Amino acid sequence: LPDELAARLAAVRDQVAAAARRAGRDPERVGIVAVTKTLPPAAVRAALAVGLEDIGENYVQEARAKRDALGGGGTWHLIGGLQRNKARLAVATFDHVETVDSAVVARALATEADRVGRRLRVSIQVNATADPRKRGLRPDDAGALAETILGLGGLDLRGLMTIGPMGPAEHSRPSFRLLKELRDAVEKRLGVELPHLCMGMSDDFPVAVEEGATLLRLGRALFGDRGPGAWRPGPSAGGEGS
């Protein structure tokens, strides 16, 4: 399975490079977050072994358990929604929270980060599709939340994040383009640099690269459609740490 992961990663990087060339971009400016939700620590270990340093998890407690099992390594991203009451554990677990979508959550994270003496990287999640089922704030509200975050200690605002609509990859282009335009407008209005556009998943990442993505969130494109059991050793193998 680690060999399959390496082969899939090579194919993904080829697609990223091709999309970057089409847009006149440097492919080295495009990072990959390996999404390991529901997969065991062995999958994270394999990702780190092939050079995927950025690990994405949807649930705070699941990520904390994996970090504890692995004993360190990687840069961990929260890519799922965060409730205010999980702020303390999130600050203890993640390096970058990509899904801040309210001042309430931002303040809870800032308070905890201040308490432990660290600066937590955060991005603002924007609902760029106007789909009421998706998380994220309205594009018109992103500037105000950015201003709030910049006024808080303990947080380092890095950019904006969005999730494209379901359907063909090309359907995501307007959302991705909107996010880039919004990021540029917020930078200009507030006089800050927001280097990250966190957008693009397994079904639409080439389009995201063409539209300026700097952090892709890839699960199936790297790990396939296998369930968590595919990463567990058989009876004759050693434990998961072997």
Predicted regions and their residues:
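Divalent-metal-activated hydrolytic enzyme cores
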Residues: 214-215
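Conserved alpha/beta-domain cores
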Residues: 1-203, 209-211, 220-225, 234, ...
